[in-house]
Amino acid sequence: MRVAVLGAGYAGLTLVKRLEDALPDDEVVVVDEDGTHLVQHELHRVVRRPSLVDDITLDLGDVLDRATVREATVTDVDPDAGIATLETPEGAETLDYDAAAVCLGAATNFYDLPGVEDHATPLKRIGHAHAVRAEFFTAVEGATAADPARVVVGGAGLSGVQVAGELAALAREETDPDAVEVVLLEQLGSVAPSFPENFQRAVRDELETQGVTVRTGTAVASADAGGLDLANGERLAYDQFVWTGGIRGPPAMDGERPVVRNTLRLGEATFVVGDAGRVVDTDGQAVPASAQAAVRQARVAADNIERLLDHRRDGGNGFEPRLDGYRFDSPGWLVSVGDGAVAQVGPTVLTGRAAKLAKTSVGAGYLSSVGAVANAVDLVREELGWPDEESGEPGADGRSGGDGSDDGGEGPVRVTIDDGDDSD
């Protein structure tokens, strides 16, 4: 039998690796536009450190054992017929399957706000990160403390928080920080509005410590080449505009994120996993779009696909097998803010060195879990400033090694959570 995994983000890659083990006699096909996996929750780092691209981009052929990788764009999915339509360099093709999972992630939602899509840069792909970096240097050229450049980030979910923090850090590193104003806008009453209040407060404090101007209760109504019209009637000029204001479904789903119940089942043998759908868990709660949710949903989907195919192999007689339900239970949240970080583990909020160690641990742990151990080591070295074993050169924060105790910070923290509010 053939199982198709459409997309290779957090959900797709986790699912494929589990299916390779669970279904050794079945064909597993993963469809991805360019045959790579992007560690999305580290993408903002590329804005400041382009060298990280190699650490957070994985060739699927290097981390998969036997699955077939098809480089194509999924343009349509018929969940009842069991057919996916693909666009390849040779033209349109169809892919029939016995079971499938739609793991296509989400696209940036511009909400049809006039001019926003035309004038803002999103942050979903490597090319976007490079564009944000290039636009930053164009924006700040010639800026002075008396006449500063204004960089506006629209949307203060975790993605917006991270890119705003990174741009503020870039300003400190590459120019006079007084010559750049980084402004983070959020239409709701707090940053990270989907998260607990103590986490929100800590994130806002960290942003302001890093020099970011935070404006909550401020909605964008429209944009043009020179500025934003805000919903309150104010005109806000900008030199650079980045948009992280929300997500929508992938084009293959007509921009929709279908609602699925906790079994993640969309059709007879088609499942939706990760940000491509709106999942209602076993407690009846809507699941937030996040990397950790996508990974955990993939585990449930893998078990359910295995049960359905085993049932068919046994003749398909009698009742269908009982499928597992997904329950969202987050052990905590993490977000980077420039060189700092904020972590929430249970009711406890961590900042400073402990939070950064937790954040780096999560990123490296995820890379190791999908078989990219060398990438994990490189990421830790880059993030924590450990020296390169061959050159002895310090990493990004200039440290030359040591046991991590020289700054009075806490030791390594192991936290099995992911950050990010749009995971792909």
Residue ranges and their predicted role:
Residues 23, 297, 302-424:
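C-terminal, flexible cofactor-proximal segment of oxidoreductases
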Residues 132-182:
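Rossmann-like NAD(P)H-binding beta-loop-alpha module
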